């Protein structure tokens, strides 16, 4: 917990205002099971990351989700062949 004092002037007199920021350690768990700690102001102890670099199909080409992208490439090539001369 960090605590700092800040002086500010209000109606011609100085006052002391305390500004308190509480930080918590948070564990972020990636899709592949790896985790790391981050200091944050969110009081949640952990976050399960749904989308990260370990489960995105473009970053991890071994994932089966790329089959739909390959299917779109073949559809696009058929479309380009059909309307090539226009």
UniProtKB/Swiss-Prot annotation:
- Quote one Gene Ontology molecular function term: structural constituent of ribosome
Which ranges form a coiled coil? Answer: none
Looking at the keywords, is Zinc-finger present? no
Classify the main location: mitochondrion
Source domain of life: Eukaryota
As listed in the record, the transit peptide stretches over 1-18
What GO biological process, any one, is recorded here?
Answer: mitochondrial translation
* Gene Ontology cellular component annotations, sorted alphabetically: mitochondrial large ribosomal subunit
Where it sits in the cell: the answer is: Mitochondrion
Q: Does the keyword Mitochondrion apply?
A: yes
Q: What factors induce this protein?
A: Differentially expressed during meiosis.
Stated family: Belongs to the bacterial ribosomal protein bL31 family. Highly divergent.
UniProt subunit comment? Component of the mitochondrial large ribosomal subunit (mt-LSU). Mature yeast 74S mitochondrial ribosomes consist of a small (37S) and a large (54S) subunit. The 37S small subunit contains a 15S ribosomal RNA (15S mt-rRNA) and at least 32 different proteins. The 54S large subunit contains a 21S rRNA (21S mt-rRNA) and at least 45 different proteins.
Function field:
Component of the mitochondrial ribosome (mitoribosome), a dedicated translation machinery responsible for the synthesis of mitochondrial genome-encoded proteins, including at least some of the essential transmembrane subunits of the mitochondrial respiratory chain. The mitoribosomes are attached to the mitochondrial inner membrane and translation products are cotranslationally integrated into the membrane.
What is the protein's name according to its record? Large ribosomal subunit protein bL31m
Naturally occurring in which organism (per UniProt) = Schizosaccharomyces pombe (strain 972 / ATCC 24843) (Fission yeast)
- Please name the taxonomic classification of the source: Eukaryota, Fungi, Dikarya, Ascomycota, Taphrinomycotina
Q: Which gene encodes it?
A: tam9
């Amino acid at each position: 917990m960090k605590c700092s004092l800040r002086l500010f002037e209000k109606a011609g007199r100085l006052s002391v205002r305390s500004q308190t920021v509480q930080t918590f350690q948070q564990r972020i768990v990636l899709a592949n099971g790896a985790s790391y700690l981050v200091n944050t102001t969110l009081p949640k102890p952990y976050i399960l990351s749904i989308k990260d670099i370990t489960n995105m199909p473009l970053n991890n080409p071994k994932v089966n989700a790329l089959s739909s992208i390959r299917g779109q490439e073949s559809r696009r090539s058929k479309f380009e062949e059909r309307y090539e001369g226009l």
